[in-house]
Amino acid sequence: MDINVVITRCEDYTETLARNTRKVLPTIGRLLLISTFVEDGLRLLFNTHDHVNHFSYNWGLNYHFSLFLTIVMIINLLFGSLFVMMRYKVTESSAVLGFTIFAQVILYQLYTTYHLLTRNISIVAAIMLLVAENMLRKPKPANYTQLPRDEHEIEVTSVLLAACRVCLNLMLISMVHFDMSYTRILLCIISYGMMIFVWLGFKTRMMSFMLATWLFAYNIVLNDFWNKDAELHIIRYDFFQTLSAIGGLLLLIHTGPGEFSFDELKKKW
Protein backbone atom coordinates (compact mmCIF):
# COMPACT_ATOMS: atom_id res chain seq x y z
CA MET A 1 0.00 0.00 0.00
CA ASP A 2 1.21 3.51 -0.86
CA ILE A 3 2.66 5.28 2.19
CA ASN A 4 0.84 8.50 1.26
CA VAL A 5 -2.47 6.65 1.37
CA VAL A 6 -1.66 5.29 4.83
CA ILE A 7 -0.69 8.76 6.11
CA THR A 8 -3.85 10.29 4.65
CA ARG A 9 -6.03 7.65 6.28
CA CYS A 10 -4.29 8.17 9.62
CA GLU A 11 -4.82 11.93 9.33
CA ASP A 12 -8.49 11.46 8.49
CA TYR A 13 -8.93 9.10 11.43
CA THR A 14 -7.29 11.55 13.83
CA GLU A 15 -9.36 14.48 12.55
CA THR A 16 -12.53 12.41 12.90
CA LEU A 17 -11.49 11.39 16.40
CA ALA A 18 -10.87 15.03 17.36
CA ARG A 19 -14.31 16.05 16.05
CA ASN A 20 -16.22 13.18 17.64
CA THR A 21 -14.53 13.61 21.03
CA ARG A 22 -14.45 17.42 21.11
CA LYS A 23 -16.69 17.44 24.21
CA VAL A 24 -14.94 14.71 26.20
CA LEU A 25 -11.31 14.98 25.01
CA PRO A 26 -10.53 18.24 26.88
CA THR A 27 -11.93 16.73 30.08
CA ILE A 28 -9.78 13.61 29.72
CA GLY A 29 -6.77 15.77 28.90
CA ARG A 30 -7.29 17.98 31.96
CA LEU A 31 -7.81 14.93 34.19
CA LEU A 32 -4.55 13.35 33.06
CA LEU A 33 -2.74 16.66 33.22
CA ILE A 34 -3.64 17.43 36.85
CA SER A 35 -2.88 13.88 38.01
CA THR A 36 0.74 14.73 38.79
CA PHE A 37 -0.33 17.75 40.87
CA VAL A 38 -2.87 15.72 42.83
CA GLU A 39 -0.29 12.99 43.48
CA ASP A 40 2.29 15.58 44.48
CA GLY A 41 -0.14 17.34 46.81
CA LEU A 42 -1.17 14.09 48.49
CA ARG A 43 2.47 13.04 48.83
CA LEU A 44 3.24 16.34 50.56
CA LEU A 45 0.18 15.93 52.76
CA PHE A 46 1.05 12.43 53.96
CA ASN A 47 4.79 13.13 54.28
CA THR A 48 4.64 16.66 55.63
CA HIS A 49 7.22 16.01 58.34
CA ASP A 50 9.86 14.82 55.85
CA HIS A 51 9.42 17.86 53.61
CA VAL A 52 9.48 20.28 56.53
CA ASN A 53 12.75 18.72 57.66
CA HIS A 54 14.12 19.00 54.11
CA PHE A 55 13.46 22.75 54.01
CA SER A 56 14.83 23.26 57.51
CA TYR A 57 18.00 21.24 56.92
CA ASN A 58 18.87 22.20 53.33
CA TRP A 59 17.77 25.83 53.39
CA GLY A 60 18.21 26.65 57.06
CA LEU A 61 14.60 27.80 57.36
CA ASN A 62 12.69 28.14 60.60
CA TYR A 63 10.59 25.03 61.36
CA HIS A 64 7.31 26.96 61.47
CA PHE A 65 8.06 28.76 58.21
CA SER A 66 8.98 25.43 56.60
CA LEU A 67 5.66 24.01 57.77
CA PHE A 68 3.81 27.05 56.42
CA LEU A 69 5.61 26.70 53.07
CA THR A 70 4.66 23.02 52.83
CA ILE A 71 1.00 23.73 53.66
CA VAL A 72 0.85 26.50 51.05
CA MET A 73 2.19 24.12 48.39
CA ILE A 74 -0.35 21.45 49.39
CA ILE A 75 -3.21 23.95 49.08
CA ASN A 76 -1.91 25.28 45.75
CA LEU A 77 -1.54 21.82 44.23
CA LEU A 78 -4.84 20.32 45.39
CA PHE A 79 -7.13 23.33 45.04
CA GLY A 80 -5.45 24.51 41.84
CA SER A 81 -6.08 21.08 40.32
CA LEU A 82 -9.68 21.09 41.53
CA PHE A 83 -10.38 24.52 40.04
CA VAL A 84 -8.81 23.53 36.71
CA MET A 85 -10.94 20.41 36.56
CA MET A 86 -14.06 22.47 37.34
CA ARG A 87 -13.03 25.10 34.73
CA TYR A 88 -13.17 27.74 37.47
CA LYS A 89 -10.66 30.58 37.10
CA VAL A 90 -8.56 28.41 34.80
CA THR A 91 -5.95 31.05 33.98
CA GLU A 92 -5.43 32.01 37.61
CA SER A 93 -5.38 28.36 38.76
CA SER A 94 -2.89 27.46 36.02
CA ALA A 95 -0.67 30.34 37.12
CA VAL A 96 -0.75 29.04 40.70
CA LEU A 97 0.19 25.53 39.54
CA GLY A 98 2.97 26.89 37.33
CA PHE A 99 4.37 29.02 40.15
CA THR A 100 4.28 26.01 42.49
CA ILE A 101 6.23 23.92 39.96
CA PHE A 102 8.81 26.70 39.65
CA ALA A 103 9.10 26.94 43.45
CA GLN A 104 9.60 23.18 43.73
CA VAL A 105 12.35 23.23 41.09
CA ILE A 106 14.20 25.77 43.24
CA LEU A 107 13.41 24.36 46.69
CA TYR A 108 14.20 20.76 45.78
CA GLN A 109 17.11 21.79 43.52
CA LEU A 110 15.67 19.91 40.56
CA TYR A 111 17.58 22.17 38.17
CA THR A 112 20.73 20.15 38.85
CA THR A 113 19.38 17.10 36.97
CA TYR A 114 18.38 17.41 33.30
CA HIS A 115 16.05 14.40 33.67
CA LEU A 116 13.91 16.19 36.27
CA LEU A 117 14.29 19.68 34.83
CA THR A 118 13.10 18.75 31.32
CA ARG A 119 10.14 16.88 32.77
CA ASN A 120 9.08 19.91 34.80
CA ILE A 121 9.42 22.19 31.77
CA SER A 122 7.19 19.73 29.91
CA ILE A 123 4.59 19.95 32.68
CA VAL A 124 4.68 23.76 32.58
CA ALA A 125 4.02 23.54 28.82
CA ALA A 126 1.01 21.34 29.54
CA ILE A 127 -0.25 24.00 31.98
CA MET A 128 0.16 26.64 29.26
CA LEU A 129 -2.03 24.48 27.03
CA LEU A 130 -4.75 24.73 29.66
CA VAL A 131 -4.61 28.51 29.37
CA ALA A 132 -4.64 28.42 25.56
CA GLU A 133 -7.55 25.96 25.49
CA ASN A 134 -9.48 28.16 27.91
CA MET A 135 -8.87 31.26 25.76
CA LEU A 136 -10.02 29.46 22.61
CA ARG A 137 -13.28 28.30 24.20
CA LYS A 138 -14.30 31.71 25.54
CA PRO A 139 -17.82 32.52 24.28
CA LYS A 140 -17.99 35.09 21.52
CA PRO A 141 -20.63 37.86 21.53
CA ALA A 142 -23.66 37.39 19.30
CA ASN A 143 -22.52 40.15 16.93
CA TYR A 144 -18.92 38.91 16.88
CA THR A 145 -18.81 38.49 13.11
CA GLN A 146 -19.85 42.15 12.65
CA LEU A 147 -17.15 43.45 14.99
CA PRO A 148 -13.56 44.24 13.99
CA ARG A 149 -11.41 41.15 14.42
CA ASP A 150 -9.35 41.05 17.62
CA GLU A 151 -5.96 40.05 16.28
CA HIS A 152 -4.26 40.36 19.68
CA GLU A 153 -5.99 37.41 21.33
CA ILE A 154 -5.42 35.16 18.34
CA GLU A 155 -1.74 36.08 18.38
CA VAL A 156 -1.45 35.29 22.09
CA THR A 157 -3.05 31.86 21.74
CA SER A 158 -0.92 31.07 18.71
CA VAL A 159 2.27 32.00 20.56
CA LEU A 160 1.16 29.90 23.53
CA LEU A 161 0.42 26.90 21.34
CA ALA A 162 3.74 27.21 19.52
CA ALA A 163 5.65 27.40 22.82
CA CYS A 164 3.70 24.45 24.17
CA ARG A 165 4.51 22.29 21.15
CA VAL A 166 8.21 22.89 21.66
CA CYS A 167 8.34 22.43 25.44
CA LEU A 168 5.79 19.65 25.83
CA ASN A 169 7.95 17.08 24.06
CA LEU A 170 10.90 17.62 26.39
CA MET A 171 9.39 14.68 28.28
CA LEU A 172 10.84 12.49 25.52
CA ILE A 173 14.33 13.95 25.88
CA SER A 174 14.29 13.05 29.58
CA MET A 175 13.90 9.38 28.66
CA VAL A 176 17.43 9.11 27.29
CA HIS A 177 19.85 7.26 29.57
CA PHE A 178 23.43 6.22 28.93
CA ASP A 179 22.71 2.59 29.85
CA MET A 180 19.86 2.12 27.38
CA SER A 181 19.47 -1.03 25.30
CA TYR A 182 19.49 -0.93 21.50
CA THR A 183 15.73 -1.51 21.46
CA ARG A 184 15.05 1.51 23.65
CA ILE A 185 17.45 3.62 21.59
CA LEU A 186 15.51 2.67 18.44
CA LEU A 187 12.21 3.55 20.13
CA CYS A 188 13.61 6.91 21.20
CA ILE A 189 14.80 7.68 17.66
CA ILE A 190 11.33 6.91 16.27
CA SER A 191 9.64 9.00 18.96
CA TYR A 192 12.05 11.90 18.33
CA GLY A 193 11.03 11.81 14.69
CA MET A 194 7.40 12.28 15.72
CA MET A 195 8.48 14.94 18.22
CA ILE A 196 10.09 17.03 15.47
CA PHE A 197 6.83 16.91 13.48
CA VAL A 198 4.94 18.21 16.52
CA TRP A 199 7.54 20.93 17.08
CA LEU A 200 7.09 22.14 13.51
CA GLY A 201 3.31 21.84 13.68
CA PHE A 202 3.27 19.46 10.72
CA LYS A 203 0.49 16.84 10.79
CA THR A 204 0.17 17.88 14.42
CA ARG A 205 -2.98 16.04 15.44
CA MET A 206 -1.87 12.73 13.96
CA MET A 207 1.62 12.94 15.49
CA SER A 208 0.25 14.07 18.86
CA PHE A 209 -2.10 11.10 18.88
CA MET A 210 0.73 8.71 18.02
CA LEU A 211 2.99 10.22 20.69
CA ALA A 212 0.25 10.07 23.31
CA THR A 213 -0.40 6.41 22.48
CA TRP A 214 3.32 5.57 22.59
CA LEU A 215 3.87 7.42 25.88
CA PHE A 216 0.87 5.66 27.43
CA ALA A 217 2.24 2.23 26.48
CA TYR A 218 5.74 3.24 27.61
CA ASN A 219 4.33 4.46 30.92
CA ILE A 220 2.35 1.31 31.68
CA VAL A 221 5.22 -1.04 30.82
CA LEU A 222 8.22 0.76 32.33
CA ASN A 223 6.72 2.90 35.11
CA ASP A 224 4.58 0.17 36.70
CA PHE A 225 5.14 1.34 40.27
CA TRP A 226 2.35 -0.97 41.51
CA ASN A 227 4.56 -3.98 40.69
CA LYS A 228 7.79 -2.63 42.17
CA ASP A 229 9.03 -2.07 45.70
CA ALA A 230 12.48 -0.63 45.00
CA GLU A 231 12.56 3.08 44.09
CA LEU A 232 8.77 3.18 44.37
CA HIS A 233 8.56 6.95 44.87
CA ILE A 234 10.77 7.72 41.86
CA ILE A 235 8.85 5.39 39.53
CA ARG A 236 5.49 6.71 40.74
CA TYR A 237 6.73 10.27 40.22
CA ASP A 238 7.73 9.42 36.62
CA PHE A 239 4.40 7.67 36.02
CA PHE A 240 2.23 10.64 36.95
CA GLN A 241 4.46 13.18 35.23
CA THR A 242 4.23 11.15 32.02
CA LEU A 243 0.43 11.06 32.42
CA SER A 244 0.44 14.85 32.58
CA ALA A 245 2.43 15.06 29.34
CA ILE A 246 -0.09 12.71 27.70
CA GLY A 247 -2.88 14.98 28.91
CA GLY A 248 -1.10 17.91 27.30
CA LEU A 249 -0.87 16.05 23.99
CA LEU A 250 -4.60 15.28 24.14
CA LEU A 251 -5.30 18.98 24.66
CA LEU A 252 -3.07 19.72 21.66
CA ILE A 253 -5.17 17.33 19.56
CA HIS A 254 -8.25 19.27 20.66
CA THR A 255 -6.90 22.80 20.15
CA GLY A 256 -4.85 22.15 17.04
CA PRO A 257 -1.35 23.54 16.42
CA GLY A 258 -2.24 27.23 16.14
CA GLU A 259 -1.33 29.73 13.44
CA PHE A 260 2.44 29.39 13.84
CA SER A 261 2.63 25.95 12.27
CA PHE A 262 3.15 24.23 8.93
CA ASP A 263 -0.41 22.89 9.06
CA GLU A 264 -1.84 26.44 9.06
CA LEU A 265 0.67 27.69 6.49
CA LYS A 266 -0.42 24.92 4.10
CA LYS A 267 -4.02 26.14 4.35
CA LYS A 268 -2.97 29.69 3.41
CA TRP A 269 -0.91 28.46 0.46
UniProtKB/Swiss-Prot annotation:
GO biological process: Golgi organization
Cellular compartment(s): Membrane
InterPro entries associated with the record: Surf4
Superkingdom: Eukaryota
Residue window of motif Di-lysine motif: 266-269
Segments traversing the membrane: 65-85, 156-176, 182-202, 206-226, 242-262
Cellular component, GO annotation: endoplasmic reticulum; endoplasmic reticulum-Golgi intermediate compartment; membrane
Keyword terms: Membrane, Transmembrane, Transmembrane helix
Topology term for the membrane: Multi-pass membrane protein
Family to which the UniProt record says this protein belongs: Belongs to the SURF4 family.
Domain statement: The di-lysine motif confers endoplasmic reticulum localization for type I membrane proteins.
Name recorded for this polypeptide: Uncharacterized protein T02E1.7
Source organism: Caenorhabditis elegans
